[in-house]
């Protein structure tokens, strides 16, 4: 079973709500630490660590594909069935959350996707991305975690972090990345990286639950993806956070919490 941490809501008014939070690649549940205290005033929170990350102990002999992760999430969420569950996922966690919303056994009441894609639509681009994922996996295995993190931090995707985050926060995120196991990260990339994600675009119109998409203004690629998703998801709202890039929850934590709490409150009013 996946590793998780449960934080019970301090609010009797929202005692039936549960927000499940899934982190991104080369990360773990601690990425959400600064949000827990505030969010727990409005909802119970469950942070779950994906295969190969943090304290997860998924067996290396298993294939960590999306069907496997869905089954693992089913097991965890079975314990929390009494709650009205909204699932949030960032980037890799967002792709996982979207897959779960469409294929999981436990019905969700809402879905929050932060900087996430429904997958790659054409085979040529998919093949290219599988090669990129494989190259990154080899860097992790051969060069090690520090070399990989140094390269990862230089990606244009994260350029806005230097302006939007304090030095202390950037250091905290760096230390979290460096604490990951490079061999297990390599397996995660190969098993459920973007290249190996099923194309979920054709299924988006089947989402019957409310969906909230959060993207940073500077993250043009994912702003474009969000707007295309909004066109086909029946009950969808898109929030473009000013000045932020890909990692909205760490670049503008306050605005992220405002959006999430607002979405949860709307869901509760509609029950």
Q: Predicted regions span which residues?
A:
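Conserved HGGG/HGGXW glycine-rich cap/lid loop of the alpha/beta-hydrolase fold
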Residues: 5-58
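Active-site loop/oxyanion-hole signature of alpha/beta-hydrolase fold enzymes
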Residues: 46-88, 258
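Gly/Ala-rich beta-loop-alpha elbow adjacent to hydrolase catalytic centers
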Residues: 89-93, 97
């Amino acid at each position: 079973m996946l590793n998780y941490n449960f934080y019970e809501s301090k609010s009797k008014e929202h005692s039936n709500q549960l927000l499940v939070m899934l982190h991104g690649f080369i990360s773990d549940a601690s990425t959400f630490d600064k949000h827990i205290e505030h969010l727990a005033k409005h909802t119970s929170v469950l942070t779950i660590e994906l295969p190969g990350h943090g304290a997860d102990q998924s067996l290396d002999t298993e294939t960590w594909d999306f069907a496997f992760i869905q089954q693992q999430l089913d097991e965890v969420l079975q314990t929390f069935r009494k709650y009205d569950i909204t699932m949030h996922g960032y980037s890799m966690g967002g792709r996982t959350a979207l897959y779960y919303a469409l294929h999981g056994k436990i019905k969700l009441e809402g879905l929050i996707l932060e900087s996430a894609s429904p997958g790659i639509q054409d085979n040529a681009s998919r093949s290219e991305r599988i090669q990129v994922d494989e190259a990154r996996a080899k860097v992790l295995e051969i060069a090690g975690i520090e070399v990989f993190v140094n390269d990862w931090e230089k990606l244009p995707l994260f350029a806005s972090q230097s302006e939007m985050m304090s030095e202390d926060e950037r250091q905290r995120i760096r230390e979290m990345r460096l604490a990951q196991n490079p061999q297990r990260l390599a397996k995660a990339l190969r098993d459920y990286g973007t290249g190996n994600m099923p194309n979920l675009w054709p299924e988006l119109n089947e989402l019957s639950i409310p969906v909230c998409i959060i993207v940073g203004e500077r993250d043009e690629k994912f702003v474009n993806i969000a707007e295309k998703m909004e066109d086909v998801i029946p009950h969808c709202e898109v929030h473009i956070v000013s000045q932020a890039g890909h990692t909205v929850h760490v670049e503008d934590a306050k605005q992220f919490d405002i959006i999430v709490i607002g979405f949860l409150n709307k869901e509760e009013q509609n029950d």
